[in-house]
Design a protein with these regions (language model features):
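Bacterial N-terminal signal peptides that target proteins for export
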Residues: 1-8
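Serine/proline-rich low-complexity intrinsically disordered segments, especially terminal tails, linkers
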Residues: 4, 105-111, 134-136
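Hydrophobic helical h-region of N-terminal Sec-dependent signal peptides
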Residues: 8-16
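N-terminal small/polar-rich segments of proteins
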Residues: 23-123, 142-187
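Short, surface-exposed beta-strand/strand-loop-strand elements in extracellular ectodomains
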Residues: 120-134
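Serine/threonine-rich, repeat-prone extracellular segments and beta-strand-based repeat modules
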Residues: 132, 136-138, 144-147
Length: 187
């Protein structure tokens, strides 16, 4: 076989094996003034489900604390008068925490989980149910141990959650510490 025939055979074989995806949309136009040619191009953007949730100080790993010190202001334990925050750390120092929720999901739920607050010296328990939380009406704060479903998304919401100690029960003198975990789940 001659070199010329071999080259032609190789070129034909390569052309037949070329994938169709390398061919772009095209049009040839010719003529006088106003001649046009156009080509179409399609786009695709793939966006996965996502959720961002923040309670308190901005930053991954920041855990704020809200303090209720019944020694401050001469509050009597168990007198039924609610106690506002008297200190804490980060955004929780005044008992008013910034909350932000962003998600492209059509529905989400927020759950509040945690055991009890445990006394450091007595190992006694103080239930989270003795702490009340309210919201500004944008992001519903769930009761401790409960879950709330939010209205249809997508969501780009901010709110403030305000905490107080109910002070309706009498507990042994101690410092009671505990952590509640708020979890947002896309549904």
């Amino acid at each position: 076989m001659s070199f010329r025939k071999l080259t032609l055979a190789a070129a034909v074989a390569m052309a037949m094996g070329a994938p169709a995806t390398v061919v772009a949309d095209s049009e040839f136009g010719f003529g006088g003034t106003g001649t046009q040619a156009s080509a179409d191009l399609s786009f695709r953007i793939i966006i996965p489900d996502f959720v961002f949730f923040q309670v308190g100080t901005v930053g991954n790993g920041n855990v704020d604390r809200v303090d209720f010190d019944l020694n401050a202001g001469g509050v009597e334990s168990g007198d039924g008068n609610a106690v506002g925050a008297t200190g804490g750390t980060g955004d929780g120092a005044d008992g008013i925490l910034a909350v932000e929720l962003r998600s492209n999901a059509s529905n989400v739920s927020i759950a509040a989980t945690g055991g009890n607050l445990t006394g450091l010296a007595t190992a006694g328990n103080l239930p989270f149910a003795d702490i009340s939380a309210s919201d500004g009406g944008t992001i519903t704060v769930p009761d401790f141990g409960a879950t709330v479903n939010l209205a249809a998304g997508p969501y780009n919401l901010t709110d403030q959650w305000v905490y107080s100690y109910d002070n309706t029960s009498v507990y042994a003198p101690d410092q009671y510490d505990g952590t509640v975990t708020y979890t947002v789940t896309t549904l």
